[in-house]
Amino acid sequence: MFRTFASTLALGIALAGAAFAETHEVKMLNKGTDGERMVFEPAFLQVAPGDTVVFVPTDKSHNAETVDGMMPGGVEGFVGKISQEVAFTFDTAGLYGVICKPHYAMGMVMTIEVGEVDAVPSTFFEGRVPKKAKERCDAQLSNL
């Protein structure tokens, strides 16, 4: 009987966590409300572990994908197809860089903070990051 109670309690706790998870929408745009071209809106998003983010190609010819080195180690990222909606559930706390591959050089990048992040990991900008993308990412990270 205790085993059944413990199993039921564990299942209830797991389901309760899923019930409180939120879904956030990010638009992929040719022009943002601030006049900037080739943007994600919002450009910075803070979510809780277990939350899902849906990337919506409001304007065509965009995708959303994570970047190796711009997300927590051991996490398998995602790659959305051009002009198609993609959803991803962020289970692991940390910072995530998300880009639009065709417009990365134009600075189409966003940052997602999952849980509480105290500082930008030293490996977050490893590799080649286009100048405009780096500028926008730096501005987004000022939200930490």
Residue ranges and their predicted role:
Residues M1-S7:
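Bacterial N-terminal signal peptides that target proteins for export
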Residues T8-A16:
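Bacterial N-terminal signal peptides
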Residues G17-A21:
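Sec/Tat signal peptide C-region and signal peptidase I cleavage site
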Residues E22-D34, M106-L144:
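Extracytoplasmic/periplasmic copper-protein system
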Residues E22-E25, E41-A64, E85-T92, Y96-I99:
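Beta-strand cores of secreted/periplasmic/IMS beta-sandwich domains, seen most often
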Residues A48, S61-G69, A133, D138-L144:
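Copper-binding active sites and cupredoxin-like electron-transfer domains
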Residues V56-K81, M110:
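Histidine- and aromatic-enriched segments that form or immediately flank copper-ligand environments
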Residues K101-H103:
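Beta-strand-rich extracellular modules
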